[in-house]
Amino acid sequence: MADLTWHDALDPEQAEEITRLLAEAEEVDGVAPVGEAVHLRLRPGASGSAHLLARADGVLAGYAHLDLLGDSDGNLVAELAVRPGSRRAGVGSELAGALLGAAADRGKPVRFWAHGDREGASGLAARLGARRVRELWVMRRELAGLPEVPPLPEGVALRSFEPGRDEDAVVRVNARAFSWHPEQGAMTADDVRLKEAEDWFDADGFLLAVDGADRLLGFHWTKRHDESMGEVYVVGVDPDAQGGGLGKALTLAGLVHLKSTGLRDVHLYVESDNSPAVRVYTRLGFSRWKADVQYAL
């Protein structure tokens, strides 16, 4: 059995150790075992998390993250990873059991993310009796051969995001555009500022659609992952500005920006049951690449 310890905060050595484990898992599996939000919570001073470390023979064998802030539906959210060299020894089951116990102690339900929908995760879910409740598709296309950017609605212009000026407006539009979404709709100005400090942040690739009074109507936040891959990180349009083609224009303008930086491919995330969005992205040349699955008990 592994030695399990809970931590409300991590020291730099623990954070570095966890980062190495996550990198090992991603290299072997071809998919990151945890989402971006978990990586941000590894930073000094980050709050709202319970970190679970599993050690075996003095080695960090596994890591689990419990998001105590949860989603907008009142669920705690869990993600876990097992070091490749420590797999098939029950570490994943021990981590999952401890996460379930921690959620029960808090009197809250918990959801588990399985990134990449890998066989090991689905097997663990089956042993726990968990059911699939969400599937988040990753859709992808090449940046070559993009459709033309359609004209913007009358009176609307595009400009780049300005740090220190636009955070509150982005949060306002985001909350209205994603009021239905368990995670995205909860984004705060502090979340935006935290991501501004990331190496990948590029204000020129954060496109804002504004009216004549500079009131924000929508935005396309792009992200560069490496020398070849970009991401449609978030596209949000105020409900009052929807229906006039602004979302499509913003999406394509962001793709053109990513292509101009020398990238070859782009991906995005979309709920599998959001049929209208899937149809829009399919018409824009995207196709399903892989999926992340969320489980509940």
From Swiss-Prot:
Q: Which UniProt keywords apply?
A: Acyltransferase, Repeat, Transferase
- Main function: Catalyzes the transfer of acetyl from acetyl-CoA to desacetylmycothiol (Cys-GlcN-Ins) to form mycothiol.
Read off the Gene3D superfamilies from this record: 3.40.630.30
Q: Which GO terms describe its molecular function?
A: mycothiol synthase activity
| Assembly and binders | Monomer.
Alphabetized Pfam families for the sequence: Acetyltransf_1
* GO BP, sorted A to Z: mycothiol biosynthetic process
- Residues annotated as binding 1D-myo-inositol 2-(L-cysteinylamino)-2-deoxy-alpha-D-glucopyranoside are E36, E183, K223, E231, Y269
**What positions does the domain N-acetyltransferase occupy?**
8-153, 156-297
Q: Where does acetyl-CoA 2 bind?
A: 235-237, 242-248, 274-279
Quick check: keyword NAD in the entry? no
Tell me what reaction this enzyme catalyses: 1D-myo-inositol 2-(L-cysteinylamino)-2-deoxy-alpha-D-glucopyranoside + acetyl-CoA = mycothiol + CoA + H(+)
**Mind telling me what this protein is named?**
Mycothiol acetyltransferase
For this protein, what is the EC number? Answer: 2.3.1.189
Can you tell me which family this protein belongs to? Belongs to the acetyltransferase family. MshD subfamily.
What's the gene? Answer: mshD
Q: Which residues bind acetyl-CoA 1?
A: L80, A81, V82
